[in-house]
Design a protein with these regions (language model features):
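Short, charged beta-turn/beta-strand-edge "cap" motif at the junction between a beta-strand
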Residues: 78-84
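Compositionally biased, charged N-terminal/linker segments
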Residues: 2-71, 165-168, 173-185
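Short, conserved phosphate/pyrophosphate- and ester-handling motifs at nucleotide-, phospho-/glycolipid
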Residues: 162
Length: 185
């Protein structure tokens, strides 16, 4: 192989061999955590709870998103039907593929194959879930939709959230958790 076949062109502005331009990674290889919202049915949230909040599977069509998840990323759970925020967790492993049935979908062939191990941060009892309606007006993410259609922000399965929005929701989940502990004393 000649040198020209071995190395990509080093001239500024020249395209990479694949025809796509390539971005250089910042040295150090670290990045800030990403923040995600998992939209889950009550049954699938229950399945995650039954597994001790140790694993989360995501739908097959979301492989690219899940591939960007890293250890230390944060997930929060929005539960449909109840329209409430129920828990926050931290991603504890890189993505892997597993077709063992745990979660259910209306699509018969969906087995949530893209999985990450997780570690629970805050988990609320169902009676303490934080209603999304109470927080929606405070979330930048929700402002993409007209106010009368705020619930559209919670359609789909996995969404990237701004850190500030995640913090607003997690603070309310934490407050709800502390309220429950105070009432129990």
């Amino acid at each position: 192989m000649s040198d020209s076949e071995n190395h990509e062109s080093s001239e500024p502005g020249s395209p990479a061999r694949s025809g796509r331009s390539r971005r250089k990674r910042k040295s150090g290889g670290t990045r800030n955590a990403q923040y995600w919202m998992v939209v889950s049915s009550p049954d699938n949230f229950r399945k995650t709870r039954e597994h001790g909040f140790s694993i989360q599977g995501l739908k097959s069509r979301h492989r690219r998103r899940v591939e960007t998840m890293r250890v230390g990323d944060r997930l929060l759970y929005y539960v449909t039907g109840r329209m409430g925020f129920a828990a926050t967790v931290t991603v504890a492993s890189p993505m892997y593929e597993d077709h063992t049935p745990i979660w259910r979908s209306s699509r018969r062939d969906e087995d949530y194959p893209w999985r990450v191990h997780i570690r629970a941060d805050f988990v609320l009892d169902e009676a303490d879930w934080v209603p999304a309606k109470e927080l929606a007006y405070r979330l930048d993410y929700v402002r993409k939709w007209p106010p009368e259609h705020w619930t559209l922000a919670f359609q789909g399965h996995i969404h990237a959230l701004p850190r500030a929005d995640f913090s607003v929701i997690e603070d309310e989940i934490s407050r709800s958790s502390r309220r429950r502990k105070t009432l129990a004393v």
